[in-house]
């Protein structure tokens, strides 16, 4: 589908919502995520992206795992369809 030009926080919410749907299709949720990679086109937007990203892991902390999965954030010169953020996730169902 076509993407509407949104601000970075709206884009991040949309990406996380899409990832939530993919996880649910696999019988998982954000508590099963072990690693993420965030690609952004402007590192100055890191704080805005991080604020949204963190909300999706608010209920994750337990004795068996940290509050957030391992993560790196990388600035890239461009992303497909001129979006400003892309997130890759690895999830494991134990």
Locate predicted features:
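Short, polar/acidic, helix-capping and beta-turn segments at strand->helix junctions
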Residues: 1-94
